[in-house]
Amino acid sequence: MFDSTKKSLHSMSDSANRFQNKITSKLPGEHGEDAMYDIRSVHGTGPRLSIKYVDVTKLPPPPKHASQLRAGGSSTGSTPRTASPAVGNQDYSKPSYSQPSYSQPSQPPKEPALPSRGTPSLPSRPGSRPSVLNQEQVPPPPVRPNVMSQMPPPPSYSSSGSYSQTYQSNANYTASSPLPTASANAPLPVPPPRRVSQNSSYASGSVPAATAASTASPVKKPPPPAPPKPRRLAARTSSNSSGVSSPTSVPPPVQRNTRPNL
């Protein structure tokens, strides 16, 4: 099994090499060795990155690792490598950046972005906030007068005069606009006559059963009959009184798509 697979892989690689040689032979001479016409990475026979003629000694130093950038930007302790390894032996564990750093030490910031709370900030720049030493020269804010003292006192609703006035105003409103009440002499609305069957006699006090039933509740329709069960299902599920199903005669299925016997 393994030998046959190996032979098939060898034959595939040989055919791919022959196909590549046939294509490169048809290309012009100045473009035959160009990286743009290298199709080994497309067909998977060569390296994934078909980069040719790379001088490793002329490459810039690799970018610094994040652990080396924390030491205040000083690159004295770490010795940068002058040449990067080959393409095949490149170490992918460290992060690679698009723009390599050319070993320029990062300059520390000249002044902090936000001053600390303990040290007073010096008023060197124009438009800055006054320092703690110059706070005595700032005039205090003007004192606002008491607004509540200028307002009149609120009306007292607990006195008897105001309560009687409001009660009288409510009484006047009620007397001026009385509510519409039903007068005693107005005739009462006549109820609609009840539906009575023609052959009923109320004089004798006997009420027919149909009228009583119609006044009590509407007549309900009887439920529809249950659909009959199919014959085969009923024959299979039929059982004796003892619970054991008895073998009953099941009719043969009807063959519908058959030709009639001529």
From Swiss-Prot:
Chain intervals with Low complexity compositional bias: 92-105, 114-131, 157-169, 203-219, 235-248
Keywords: Cytoplasm
Primary subcellular site in the record, as a coarse category: cytoplasm
Region feature Disordered, mapped onto this chain: 1-262
Bias kind Polar residues: ranges: 10-24, 170-184
GO cellular component, one term: cell division site
Record bears the keyword Cytoplasm: yes
Protein localization: Cytoplasm
Name used for this protein in its record: Uncharacterized protein P8B7.26
